[in-house]
């Protein structure tokens, strides 16, 4: 099937979906209605661009016909030639855009995410940088109109974060933040540095798509659930009733502890949401590693321990090492203006996939 047959098939299916979504039987079936609505939304842009492309093709045919009929009318002929020239340029642009739109979609792109940030090498300075990254993503989410909820945070005593887990909810969150997983390096002079020397520290970021219970079922026999008293500053028990929850997935030894909420059930629900995402991500990463062993990985699926970005404070510089992008906009980026970086990563990823497809 060539590209035009594929595009026509997408348009035919889009029209079929429009009819199905107005069918009372489909509307009354919530699960099916949501699935078909998602499918329609995913193909909407492709269909819109394809229809514009077909109009441009028609414009070319009309202009060619006009040139034939314009003998003896130089002004009309010149106008038709200009229309033909512009339409041919537009046709090439639409064809390029359609090739990208036909690339296989990541099924997780529309999902919410679980975001984990940990201070790594560098002690207190790494924990402070983890806090900076949290603030950066929080502001970026705000700019995108997403909901950002800190689910669990572990402070280090100097205003930094040893670890933080957040849920980011909204439209196409994973499609934009999936490239953030990896090691983020910071180069700056710590407040405690009397000699003015630049120190290097690292924080790690992990982005996982939210996994619904119906999508990934964990056998209850594989879980150990401990209930205990939540502790406050200094380790004292802050609740008379045990509300804190620890869940361990025995086959992988993945552990989640939750004590932020006031009730055991709410802590359990949040812990299950995180552990479901972590376990699903664990097995997805194993499968991805096997796949990457056979072919070169794209930017979106690199080694989780790979250093992906450096934030250099003295030079106000941010460098993304995967695509060789350097921007002298550190202040702006840390204040949540990540669009230029993320757009470049998406374009690079799509270009790599297109090259892979054309091999």
Curated annotation (Swiss-Prot):
PTM statement from Swiss-Prot or TrEMBL: Methylated by PrmC. Methylation increases the termination efficiency of RF1.
Chain positions with N5-methylglutamine modification: 236
SUPFAM superfamilies per the UniProt record, alphabetical: Release factor
This protein's UniProt keywords: Cytoplasm, Methylation, Protein biosynthesis
InterPro entries: PCRF, Pep_chain_release_fac_I, Pep_chain_release_fac_I_sf, Prokaryotic/Mito_RF, RF-1
GO MF annotations in UniProt: translation release factor activity, codon specific
Cytoplasm recorded as keyword: yes
UniProt xrefs under SMART domains: PCRF
Main location: cytoplasm
Keyword Protein biosynthesis: yes
Pfam families, A to Z: PCRF (PF03462), RF-1 (PF00472)
UniProt similarity note: Belongs to the prokaryotic/mitochondrial release factor family.
Function: Peptide chain release factor 1 directs the termination of translation in response to the peptide chain termination codons UAG and UAA.
Protein name (Swiss-Prot/TrEMBL): Peptide chain release factor 1
Protein species of origin: Streptococcus mutans serotype c (strain ATCC 700610 / UA159)
Top-level taxonomy: Bacteria, Bacillati, Bacillota, Bacilli, Lactobacillales
